[in-house]
Amino acid sequence: MAVPEKSTKERLMSFLDDLEVLSRELIEMLALSRNQKLSQPGEENQILELLIQKDGEFQELMKVALSQGKIHQEMQVLEKEVEKRDSDIQQLQKQLKEAEHILATAVYQAKEKLKSIDKARKGAISSEELIKYAHRISASNAVCAPLTWVPGDPRRPYPTDLEMRSGLLGQMSNLPTNGVNGHLPGDALAAGRLPDVLAPQYPWQSNDMSMNMLPPNHSNEFLMESLGPNKENEEDVEVMSTDSSSSSSDSD
């Protein structure tokens, strides 16, 4: 089994011990020779030469230790750089994980959109059918009032003032209705007329129109017949349309 090589520190300590022993022997020998006045220069010279040799080896080992110290400092700098790079790699790995998650989500959404597109293509509706459907909506006055609509007309646009007062919102808000409290008598609704407090107060409305107003479920033709084709009613219609436009602009 190979003996492990000693470290530089152990070798330095060993040289220091040898130098200490040789120095002590040399000093003791010099002191003894001075007290006994014996001259034996041969042994002293051997110890001195051995001491000089050990000192030279010690100096060489010190140079090795200094070079190893520089290498150790460089290693510490490199270790710090490695730690920094490792932190950067971990951060980059985290960002890559987030990007992978985002891409996976985007791919999934893209696949779902492609499925929706394929489904839409399989069940596509022609433009002619859409135009026909739009024409039906427009013809039934579902999005706008009829061209002959005037204030007091029970047709669209909904809701009318009568419906607002008799509805749930009118009951909750407790709007002042001149003693009616938002409710209409059942016989008045059944007869298709308004109470006196809710009768139209505009000068351009005829008494026949206020007394013969029909609920929304009656036909519109009967109401137009009640207006009559005479000249006075035509003038009233013009005034009514003017007031309607002005009232709509004020409400906007």
Curated annotation (Swiss-Prot):
One of its GO terms (biological process) is regulation of transcription by RNA polymerase II. It is found in: Nucleus. Residues 70-112 form a coiled coil. Residues 218-252 are annotated as: Disordered. Residues 241-252 have a biased composition (Low complexity). Keywords: Activator, Coiled coil, Nucleus, Transcription, Transcription regulation. GO terms for molecular function: transcription coregulator activity. One of its GO terms (cellular component) is mediator complex. Pfam families: Med4. PANTHER family: MEDIATOR OF RNA POLYMERASE II TRANSCRIPTION SUBUNIT 4. Component of the Mediator complex, a coactivator involved in the regulated transcription of nearly all RNA polymerase II-dependent genes. Mediator functions as a bridge to convey information from gene-specific regulatory proteins to the basal RNA polymerase II transcription machinery. Mediator is recruited to promoters by direct interactions with regulatory proteins and serves as a scaffold for the assembly of a functional preinitiation complex with RNA polymerase II and the general transcription factors. Belongs to the Mediator complex subunit 4 family. Component of the Mediator complex. This is Mediator of RNA polymerase II transcription subunit 4. It comes from Xenopus tropicalis (Western clawed frog).
